[in-house]
Amino acid sequence: MAVLSSLLRSSARLVVTTSRLRLWELVVCKRRTWLSLSVQRCYTSDTSKSSADHLERYKELQRYFKRRLKAKYYKFSNIPDHSAVCGHHHVYFVEGDGIYRMDTRQSEQEQVLNLGQVSGQEEKTGVDNEEMKQRFQWTVQRIRLSPQEKHLAATLKTNHSEELRCVVVRLGQMNSPFLDPPHVVFTLDKVFSFEWATDEVLFYTTLEGLRCSRVFRLDLTSNRSRITSVYEETHPDVFVEVVLSRNRQILTINCNSRTTSEVLLIDTTTSHLKPFLVQPRQQDLLYHVEHWRRWLIILANTGPGQEYQVVQAPLSEPSMVSWVTLFTPGPGTAVKDMDVVRDHCVLVARTPASELVLIVVSLTHPKEAYTVQLPSWTCAINPKKPDMADQRRVFEFLISSPVHSPVPYCLYPEDGLLLSGTKDGSSPENQGNYTTTRLEAYNQDGTLVPITLFHMVPVEGLTQAPLLVHVYGAYGRDLNMEFCPEKRLLLEQGWALAYCHIRGGGERGLSWQRQARVEGKQKGVEDLQACLRHLFSLGVSSPSLTALTACSAGAVPVGALCNKHPHMMRAVTLQAPFLDVLGTMEDPSLPLTLEDREEWGDPVGNPKHRLTISSYCPLHNITPQCYPSILLTAYSGDTRVPLAGVLKYTEQLKKAIHTYITMKPKSECKPAPNIVLNIQSGANHLGPEDFELMLEEEALRLAFLYTELGLDPPQPSRKRKIVRLSGIK
């Protein structure tokens, strides 16, 4: 599935990361022999006290939360996931030291790839110091099998770099004495996406910096291997990716910018494997292609209001003049994804009530569309990649929410039958008494902004509850609402969790993003303010018990709100925060400046854009006043968010607070806010992929929140009430 992910991913200030639960599985598996990773922690200092000293005040509580989090992850270590890859005769899976496979008829497993052997090639990266070599830890990102299971290709990533390495393994018959065991036959560096067209032909894209612009073809023959160039994109704001259709008969070359799409097709059933164009790019046209029989099923924003609808075109005449509408969703319903399952198109959609549903459209009788209701708490849908040998007419997926662990479901589109993996529709462990409330806040311009609130007691009983508010609002991307054990822990300790779906994101369709792009960016800040006011008006928590959390571009509305209304929250945690919008967009030499102009604007070439950015940029609007306490976590090698901007923001913020307290010693700014900068090594934009390091980072955030909000540490399960520390306002 993941049809729209390529349209959203591009090279934005966001990434798709390995599931944290998956990281835990890698830790507890019996074959764990990960290469050791030594990570140095670097802390900057200010004029009075270093951030390292600031961090010391959280250490004891951090150790406590690390133990609690590890126990929570252990509890969920056996929940279902879709990480295994099913071939015709084998199931492939990742365990600590490599990739393994198991014959579906036997229980014995065989190693296909040893990650330790891959790590012996650091010389390609110029690393010659033994201590530095020990910092390399390979994690498997993606696995692809060739059609007849002759070859396996996998991309691997290290903590120190965004670049991926693709390893091609020739597979033999399992445990056969007559054939060679699985062994590496080819290695490619800087590979981002890759798909097999045949057993001997692999198409792939390469990542240069943060941009994919070239497609190559690798031919594996008995004599020698050959690499040829297939496609090169010349537009600097276009990101290129290769994707295989569900039925494996069409390989697409997707060329997407923020506002345009262009798709080339390769028919894998033909011998020449030459790409041909579907529809030339044109401004504000977005589309994605799937395959059904000899037709193309296209998800395109040609519907009312330039929203997504489903159209059809013959494979022989794929251009826009041949597009015929199959299905248009009703007003207020936003299509989030599409899949083709035999003779049906399955759409993931969000209703006007902000609930996720499945819409099934018969491709033989398009007017016979029907809607499949899911549990009301559903906030995320994770489809399973179809098995190679699976010809069933079934769509398998997992549903979850930040506090509900994944539950497996099977949909049989032809019969309209929906089955859960458990009898009662819950996950194997008890989901608990967790309430999901969907709210709407009125912005000053009359726009209704959705809020998803998770809580364990009725809303009227949340007055004294601490509140953690999540926000993003950029690139048309929805807030990440997959299951997270940390959120479950907070909820069980009496917290309320709010997810504010502000404009700039994609929760209410493409227009939701368009309203808060470039000159409309202030609307996202106003939406966040409206959400907080609405929650407080309902009696949910209070400013002194409220914390905001965001990552990457989500730091922009949070930072802007802190400048305008710092008394609306007591604490903030930011991860890999994008805070210097003006400085970044003024510098075309930075990796994402040119690509991001359609999102943030061009302050160099357009005076209006410069004025707009200057009005909300978190760094350039810092003023002497009483700010909330802020924990900033940044990564020294992060190329998406320049570290210089985070350092400059931290320094100026501390100076502004110091100036304010000096000017007004009797001000209400007591206790003084703590501005803590935690700089970690590595290039992972959204944090370490090492489980232990991830636990330390998350435990520090929890320790920071409890300390700055003046909360007692969590009590045992029978004493969950959170009490304010005496003497702290």
What is each of the regions a protein language model found here?
Residues 211, 237, 259-261, 272, ...:
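Flexible loop/turn segments at secondary-structure boundaries
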Residues 80-81, 88-97, 296-297, 391-423:
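Structured, non-catalytic alpha/beta "coupling" segments that mediate domain-domain communication
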Residues 276-288, 323-336, 369-385, 422-432:
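Conserved blade-ending motifs and adjacent loop-strand segments that build the rim/top face
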Residues 129-134, 423-547, 551, 556-557, ...:
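Cap/lid segment of the alpha/beta-hydrolase catalytic domain
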Residues 169, 205, 254, 266, ...:
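Generic beta-strand/beta-sheet core signal
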Residues 502-729:
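Active-site-proximal cap/loop segments of hydrolase catalytic domains
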